[in-house]
């Protein structure tokens, strides 16, 4: 601020020293020396520039001079106008012009100077220009020492930063300064930014130096990471280094990228070791027996993937036979793993345990094979353990013969073969089957006796329909009755069959729950046959509708039409149709309830086939 010095006229006529702070349209903002007066704006006509410093001091008697003095002790010294009255050596007797003529004072030569010839300032006496300061440089520009070289280059009287307008103020008494400021301002701001960056780096280096000196006596570890593993050690966007720095007690981590060396400093050995575990990545291999490689990998790599996930390694590679980078033992295949030291240790434990398990299992399997071989040599029956070996067609459980209910080997094709055999069987076989089926439980196992759409329903009135055909005078509505006594009788009768039909009864017992086509042939009293002797689905539907209508009729209507229904049943089995379950007389006589031998039945059928009309498919003539 001392660079732009002016003299401000006081109320007593003396000129006091001041400094220009800002230039306005018609005034100056002035700060007084030692702040004896507050900062204020002074008009141009009360301000003048001081005389040049190299002015010659040639003073003689009678000259007007200016005396550096003060009116009282409370005011500072100022330049007062006076006149020299006498000279004696270095002392001068002066008379103040502003005071009475009687007020004289003796002063020394140093307090005197010739009268200042400078006039009061005008509007074009001082020039001011401004430069906008970027936000990142405002703090640096607040220091006036940063503009020392710039001030000298442009010839300014003063350069300072104005915080309210965020601008640099350049004050000068020369108009050429404004042109130079416009030329050099950008360069000046760039130089400030560069200096600021260098100063910041120097400060960081100084702090690092101090920190290094302090850490030299603390705990530290140093390790080297291979160049191809450096990316894993650093982590994505330096995540591993950041994680290591967050370990409590770690003070600094340094990395020399040229040599791949990490240096960790900490307050304790445990903290340094823990931080090292995050960044120290290594590659190691484990030898696996060749015959166990497939089992170690697992189906679709499931086993080796589980080992990798649990251990924490990041990569696994199996070295090929044509690669000789690693030492290889006979009959062994190297598995190469990449990860931290801790994860490599984990994978070694997991893999060694799994290999030991596989070897033990292989040993047990070999012992089993030896035992089986010894059993075959002795001649005993084959051993059937709980392994995964195949079972032959003659396999037995070893605990007795297979029961009828525990033999699950019958397939759907065997059932169809059985049905086709029965459809082509003779009348004697059908009669035997008819007698056996009539003794079964009418509703099937665990099924309702109402004869609905369930799987056990159609068998409910099987034997009763045959009895109606043989005895038309009987009550046809007995088909709807299913008493407990009938079930008991059927159950008793079903247990008295001959042992020669044991296999066939076992098959039929398993298929009783399914509504098969053969059951429809023996059960229906109205169904017609096709060329192969099979009953169609339409026949089942018509029979179910007929039975449903019979059940829904009122009791009075049922009692009234009993005899008519019996006659209809007899007429349906007249000479116009072929009988399903046996031959009928050509004259339409009632069927005698007399049993015939199988030979008589066949002879009777041959005679009737020559005289009766050929049956049409589905019973339509």
UniProtKB/Swiss-Prot annotation:
Q: Gene3D superfamilies annotated for this entry? A: 2.30.30.140, K Homology domain, type 1
Question: Cross-link Glycyl lysine isopeptide (Lys-Gly) (interchain with G-Cter in SUMO2) - where?
Answer: 56
Q: Name one GO cellular component term.
A: dendritic spine
Q: Where is the composition biased (Gly residues)?
A: 445-460
In this chain, composition skew of type Basic residues spans: 499-509
Q: Where is the composition biased (Polar residues)?
A: 394-410
The superkingdom of the source organism is: Eukaryota
* Annotated region described as RNA-binding RGG-box, given as residue ranges: 442-457
What ranges does the record list as Acidic residues composition bias?
483-493
Q: Which residues carry this modification: Omega-N-methylarginine?
A: 447, 453, 455
Q: Which residues carry this modification: Phosphothreonine?
A: 401, 483, 611
Residues that the record marks as modified (Asymmetric dimethylarginine) are 447, 453, 455
Q: Where is this region: CC2 domain?
A: 353-379
Modifications after synthesis and translation: Phosphorylation at Ser-420 by PAK1 promotes its relocalization to stress granules and activity. Phosphorylated by MAPK1/ERK2, promoting subsequent phosphorylation by GSK3B. Phosphorylated by GSK3B, promoting ubiquitination and degradation by the proteasome. Ubiquitinated by the SCF(FBXO4) complex, leading to its degradation by the proteasome: ubiquitination by the SCF(FBXO4) complex takes place following phosphorylation by GSK3B. Ubiquitinated and degraded in a GSK3B-dependent manner in during both scaling and sleep deprivation. Ubiquitinated via 'Lys-63'-linked ubiquitin, leading to its degradation: interaction with CEP63 inhibits 'Lys-63'-linked ubiquitination.
Q: Which residues form the Agenet-like domain?
A: 4-50, 63-115
Protein's cellular compartments: Cytoplasm, Cytoplasmic ribonucleoprotein granule; Cytoplasm, Stress granule; Cytoplasm; Cell projection, Dendrite
Key word Phosphoprotein present: yes
* Domain comment, as recorded: Disordered region at the C-terminus undergoes liquid-liquid phase separation (LLPS) for the formation of a membraneless compartment that stores mRNAs. The tandem Agenet-like domains preferentially recognize trimethylated histone peptides.
Q: What does this protein do?
A: mRNA-binding protein that acts as a regulator of mRNAs translation and/or stability, and which is required for various processes, such as neurogenesis, muscle development and spermatogenesis. Specifically binds to AU-rich elements (AREs) in the 3'-UTR of target mRNAs. Promotes formation of some phase-separated membraneless compartment by undergoing liquid-liquid phase separation upon binding to AREs-containing mRNAs, leading to assemble mRNAs into cytoplasmic ribonucleoprotein granules that concentrate mRNAs with associated regulatory factors.
Q: Family assignment?
A: Belongs to the FMR1 family.
Query: By what name is this protein known?
Result: RNA-binding protein FXR1
Q: Which organism is it from?
A: Cricetulus griseus (Chinese hamster)
This protein's gene is called FXR1
